[in-house]
């Protein structure tokens, strides 16, 4: 009897606070504000969410607030315009905020011949742009609804967060033939425990308090790249808030 072919391993990375410092949705919002997509008061709210996000990690309430504001600012905009802005945002804001240590981990998986996927609550287009720039396989993210090339301000299904990430991973593994038992997953948030628990090699990166406790008790690897860079990033954002108030 012929042996069934061995299923390959893959690697899956969260983006915000795992691969990139802070919220990529905030960075998109900042770029949109500079181009007068929305008023000053919305930018200030975005910035305060970012300070809290970097300092404390994600919460359901915070993610919902960021998502709602992001959807509101793209409502009525052309899809192509949004994609072009995302590419600009990567060059102007995100590229410099990629943690080189996390990016190196991703590249090590690429060098080992594994597919590397980003899985994020941010719009899928944001994840795809980052994956393309870093030479990774692809991305899964929250899907935005568009009609005749215009964004409606709604999402297709649920935000890719928490248990929804785990569902998406399971579906992707089935489609691509991955062995989850052999695979790797990286995240900073306890909200991603459903996803991390699905793979044989879960890793906590810049973990929030709850994930750090769980990872230690479970014997998972823990990487903390955040401590040395947290203070200057928070200072920079607070300066942006002051500029927004004066603007």
PLM regions and their residue ranges:
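Acidic/polar active-site rim loop that often engages polyanionic ligands
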Residues: 25-28, 48, 66-67, 149-154
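Hydrophobic alpha-helical segments typical of transmembrane helices
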Residues: 28, 66-69, 81, 126, ...
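Cysteine/selenocysteine-centered motifs that mediate thiol-based redox chemistry or coordinate metal-sulfur cofactors
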Residues: 51-65, 236
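C-terminal cap/substrate-recognition subdomain and adjoining C-terminal extension
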Residues: 2-8, 84, 91-117, 121-247
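Active-site neighborhood of HAD-like aspartate-dependent phosphohydrolases
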Residues: 2-55
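Conserved active-site and cofactor/substrate-binding residues in soluble primary-metabolism enzymes
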Residues: 23, 77, 164
């Amino acid at each position: 009897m012929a042996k069934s072919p061995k299923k390959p391993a893959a690697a899956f990375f969260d983006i915000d606070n795992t691969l990139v410092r802070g919220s990529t949705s905030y960075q998109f919002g900042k770029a949109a504000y500079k181009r007068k997509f929305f008023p000053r008061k919305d930018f200030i709210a975005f910035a305060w969410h970012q300070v809290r996000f970097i300092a404390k990690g994600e919460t359901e309430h915070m993610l919902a607030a960021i998502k709602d504001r992001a959807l509101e600012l793209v409502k009525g905009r052309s899809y192509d315009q949004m994609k072009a802005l995302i590419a600009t945002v990567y060059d102007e804001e995100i590229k410099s905020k990629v943690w080189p240590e996390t990016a190196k981990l991703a590249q090590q998986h690429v060098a080992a011949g594994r597919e590397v996927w980003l899985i994020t609550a941010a719009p899928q287009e944001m994840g795809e742009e980052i994956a393309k720039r870093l030479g990774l396989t692809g991305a899964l993210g929250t899907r935005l609804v568009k009609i005749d090339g215009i964004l409606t301000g709604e999402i297709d299904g649920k935000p890719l967060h928490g248990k929804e990430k785990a569902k998406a991973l399971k579906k992707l593994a089935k489609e691509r033939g991955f062995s989850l038992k052999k695979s790797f997953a990286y995240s900073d948030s306890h909200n991603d425990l459903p996803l991390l628990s699905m793979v044989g090699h879960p890793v906590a990166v810049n973990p929030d308090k709850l994930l750090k406790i769980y990872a230690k008790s479970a014997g998972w690897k823990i990487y903390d790249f955040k401590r040395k860079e947290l203070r200057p990033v928070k200072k920079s954002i607070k300066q942006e808030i002051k500029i927004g108030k004066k603007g």
